[in-house]
Amino acid sequence: MPAIVLIGAQWGDEGKGKATDLLGGSVQWVVRYQGGNNAGHTVVLPNGENFALHLIPSGILTPGVTNVIGNGVVVDPGVLLTELAGLEERGIDTSGLILSADAHLLMPYHVAIDKVTERYLGSKKIGTTGRGIGPCYQDKVARIGIRVADVLDEESLRQKVHAALEFKNQVLVKIYNRKALDPDQVVDGVLEQAEGFKHRIADARLQLNQALERGETVLLEGSQGTLLDVDHGTYPFVTSSNPTAGGASVGSGIGPTRITTVLGILKAYTTRVGSGPFPTELFDEHGAYLAKTGGEVGVTTGRARRCGWFDAVIARYATRVNGITDYFLTKLDVLSSLQTVPICVGYEVDGKRTNEMPMTQSEIYRATPVYEELPGWWEDISGARQFEDLPAKAQDYVLRLEELAGAPMSCIGVGPGRDQTIVRRDILSRS
C-alpha cells in the first residue's frame, strides 16, 4: 500500500489529531515527520477520554499501530519521557513507539537561547512557543546539531556538546547577559534521560520502506499547518520546519512516489495562535463566539487562539502547494446557531481584487477580505452521521467550501468525539 499524508491546511490547530485517530484503525504505521513539542493534538476517544499529545503521534492511542517519530522531528528528551509516562499511567501501551536515529535532540541551550531571543526582540518577536524548536533546527542546518543516535556514543556526544557550547555560551553571556551552561552537566543530563528511550532508537526509514513493500499502510502526520511552513507560510511568522506535504517525504525517508493521498485538515472557520497576518480575524462578538464555542485555546501553549471566518483564499493555496486530494472539515458544529455564515472568497489589496494569496507579507497585511454570506442553521448537528442528516443550509455551506477549496470535503467533523464524523468518501480506498 502507498503512504498517506495528513496536513493542516490553515495555521495549525485544525483538528489533525481527530483525523489521525479516525484513520488509525485502518493503518499499520503512523509517522510524525516534522516539528517538535511546539504543537499539540487533541484526541477524544469514544469513552470520552481526552488526550493531549505534543510529540508522540496520535496513532499511539490505537492498539496494534506502530508509531514513529521521524528524522524530521526535533525531540526534547524530557518532554518525550514525560509524555510516555503520562500515557502509560492511563493504561496506554507505548511499546510500539520507535524513534528515528537521525531525529535531532533538543538541548537545554536551545530552550535558553529561544527564550532570551524572544525577550530581546520585544515587540518585534515572532511569537514562538519558547521551547527551543527554532534554535534546534538552526543547529541542524548549520551541521552542529545533536542527533538521537549520538546518545549511543558518549565520547562523541561530549565532543559535540562541548563544541556547540563554545559558541553558544559566548552568545548567552556576552550578548544576553545570562549564565554559561556547563557542557558536562548538559551531557550527563541527556545521557540519564536516554536510558528511558535508547531501546526505541531505530533505522526508521528502513522500517517504513520495508512496511510499504509488505503492503502495509503508512500515515504521515504533520504538525502545525500550511501557512506556518517555513517556505510556503506567512514568513517570518512561521515555524522552523516544513509541515506541507513535501516535508513528509524528507522528514520520514519515504520517497515521494510512494505517496498517493494527501488529506488536508480544514477548520470550518479560521484560527491562528501568535503573531502574524490574519485577514479574516474578528474582533467583535462573532470572534468571541467562535473562541468560546470552539474552545479555542492552544493545546501546547495555553494561549487563546485568534478567530476569524473561513478563508477560501488560503484553502485554495493549501490545495495547490500540498497537492491535496481530499479534505477533512472539522468543527462544523461550532457554526450552528449563527444567522449568517460569511466566507472570505477573495481579498482587496490597494483597491484591486484578487482571489489568490498575495505574494508579499506587506500585501497580506493590507488585504481586506471580500465576503460571500450564506444563511446559517440553528439545528444541533452533533448527532449527524450521514451528509443527508445535516440541515440543507449546512450542506450548502460544506458544498460551497468544497467548490472554493478545490478538493472534496471527504470527511466532516460534527463534534470532538471519534464517532462524531461524517464520512462522505472512503479516503483509504483511494490509496
Curated annotation (Swiss-Prot):
Chain residues that bind GTP: 12-18, 40-42, 305, 331-333, 413-415
Gene3D superfamilies referenced in this protein's UniProt entry, alphabetically: Adenylosuccinate Synthetase, subunit A, domain 1 (3.40.440.10), Adenylosuccinate Synthetase, subunit A, domain 2 (1.10.300.10), Adenylosuccinate Synthetase, subunit A, domain 3 (3.90.170.10)
Organism domain of life: Bacteria
Binding positions (substrate): 299-305
Pathway entry: Purine metabolism; AMP biosynthesis via de novo pathway; AMP from IMP: step 1/2
Keyword Cytoplasm among record annotations: yes
Main subcellular location of this protein, as a coarse class: cytoplasm
Entry GO CC: cytoplasm
Compartment list: Cytoplasm
One GO biological process term: IMP metabolic process
Catalytic reaction(s) noted: IMP + L-aspartate + GTP = N(6)-(1,2-dicarboxyethyl)-AMP + GDP + phosphate + 2 H(+)
Cofactors that this protein relies on: Mg(2+)
Keyword Nucleus: no
InterPro entries the UniProt entry points to: Adenylosuccin_syn_GTP-bd, Adenylosuccin_syn_Lys_AS, Adenylosuccinate_synth_dom1, Adenylosuccinate_synth_dom2, Adenylosuccinate_synth_dom3, Adenylosuccinate_synthetase, P-loop_NTPase
Cofactor binding remark: Binds 1 Mg(2+) ion per subunit.
A molecular-function term among this protein's GO annotations: magnesium ion binding
Binding site for Mg(2+): 13, 40
PROSITE patterns found in the cross-reference section: ADENYLOSUCCIN_SYN_1, ADENYLOSUCCIN_SYN_2
Keyword field: Cytoplasm, GTP-binding, Ligase, Magnesium, Metal-binding, Nucleotide-binding, Purine biosynthesis
Subunit structure: Homodimer.
Family: Belongs to the adenylosuccinate synthetase family.
Stored NCBIfam families: PRK01117.1, purA
Name of the molecule in the record: Adenylosuccinate synthetase
Organism whose genome encodes this protein: Mycobacteroides abscessus (strain ATCC 19977 / DSM 44196 / CCUG 20993 / CIP 104536 / JCM 13569 / NCTC 13031 / TMC 1543 / L948)
Gene: purA
